[in-house]
Amino acid sequence: VFYLKRLSLFLFLLSLSYSQSAYFSAGLTARYGSGFQSSIEIGDTTRNSYVFREHTLDITAGYGNFSIWSNFEFSSPPRIGPDHLGLRKLRMMWESDYLSVSAGDLYGQFGRGLALNLWESQGIDWDSSLRGIWLTTRPNEKLTVDIVSGNSAGGRHLPIGPGVDPRIRDFSEDATVSALLLSVDNILPNLSIGLYGVDVDAFKPWFGKMQNLFGDVETVDSVNVRTRSFSPGFFVEYFGRDYDLYVEVMKRSLEIFDTDSLYSTPSFEWIYYERENKGWGGYASVSYYPGKLGLTLEYKNYFFDDSHPDIRTKLPYRLGRLAPIMNGPTAFKEHSAVLMRRTPHIMDFEDEVGIQAEVNLNVSDDLFLIFNYAQSSRHTGFRDVNYIDGYDGWEKVETESLLWFSDNEMFYPFKEFYGEFNYHYSPLNLDIRLMAARSSEIVESYVEIINELSYWENHTQEQLDWKKRDLYTLPTELTLSLPSGHGLTLYWEHQWEDYNDRNYLVYRDLSSSEIDSVTTDEILTVPYYYRYVALNLSKPSRYSAGFVYDFASGIKTGSPQNTDPANDSWLEEILRNSGVDMTNKWFGVQGSLYLTPATIFNVFYGSLQGGLKCDSGVCVYVPGIEDAFTVTITSNF
């Protein structure tokens, strides 16, 4: 704290002394929350105390060509991620017409980020920034050279499951990154190109078992294994009068050291790892915007890993996975609607090919329309086969074309339609926003087993099981501007989910390839319904007050929530005594007050639902808080 005071005083005096060319700004965010966290394990109704304290201070100052940015954090603990007390981020930058140098904590990307994308999202405890130096030189008007070198030490969270605390970062990585980018602007009129190479020398956590020097298998919590990758690539960008074109292609070569010492499952089975692995990625987009129409087409094709399910599912940390600094475009819509945010598409950056098309149409000054379509799948699928010749293992199946997606459930297909209607009704000064989305996706697992039967010659037993989620969501938002200067916003959202479980068991005659008999052929569908409502009254730059209501027809863990009156908050007690059935219902009240034009005080009391929270395709489970009291203060000066 003493250091912070001295730094703030120094920067303030600096800004006074050199007011003609100096600048200084700061932003403070302080959060406190307390409540209870319910267990997410099936059949467990335990509630544990949940408290978080997060305080961050961003300071930016500069003089002439020099600037400095720092971030202080005092969290013990934060809502998600590790504790931190003191200086967390620091970056110094000097820039001229021909040279710029940044040292410290670095953010930025090459191209669209397929090989290098340095960014941070504290809400999901994601940090792929580098601590090092970024040098940019411009020898002439067209050529730019970027040299980047530093260390990345971001962390990852395990998928939610038994024994996993979602608030704690499970693994941290230690990677040394060296990168070079050569870009040429207007090599031809309106045409720019870039060539790059990114080298990552990392120590990655391995979670499982390992063989010691005596040949015995011993359990370890986490072992760091060295990997090294090199990713060369290029991009081309063209700007037309009313259209843009962009194409980026790269490849990755990965080497895993000491593969023979790795043991990955508790059974007596070795999982073989190739010492070297090669993959590639590509992204293209076309934008067309003639007048009131905007059209964007995107294509992604990421194929870095085709590991079989033992490696994909039994190892929470696959050694062959992408480095955190590699984060290309998602090419699907990331929604702002509350319920749709809880059921996102979980993208596989290592094996996914797909498209996205979006149309924006400004029909008039009062009417604006959006239409979006996205579809994708993996390149590879697997069958678990057991042949009478002795082979027992995984059989890989590829799509008909590595350049296009498939509808076959084996390849985990995803499909979504989305439409949005925005209209301003002038006589009532009413803004209307209507949304609709329909999506379908294979979730959890796809299993296909083929057994050759020794007791029934020339026949196989084939078993198929998959789980598919179908979602239909209708969000609506109405905002009414009142004569008094107040604004009244009503938001509600309905979502219907069909959770489908397919079971299929047949016997096939190999000589004719025909099915002899069908033992089981059924799809078990479990329907769910969700509802979210929020009402808010506000006066711009003064205050706001609101009420939220959340409902689920069923809980996938099997245990209904909010059924015990002994656990009621005072708000829930009032509602229950008024005759409201509180089963699987959550309520909250919220308010905000502008203490000054730049300082906002927010308070919430009630229950906050947890779930997957995603940013740029990276998803982390953030737990909810029941009977919560949270306070947030935000100030800029």
Predicted regions and their residues:
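Conserved radical SAM core fold
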Residues: 109-111, 154, 202, 439
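Exposed, low-structure sequence patches enriched in small/polar residues
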Residues: 52-54, 188, 197, 225-637
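Flexible, glycine/proline-enriched loop segments at strand-loop-helix junctions
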Residues: 120-122, 162-172, 181, 220-223
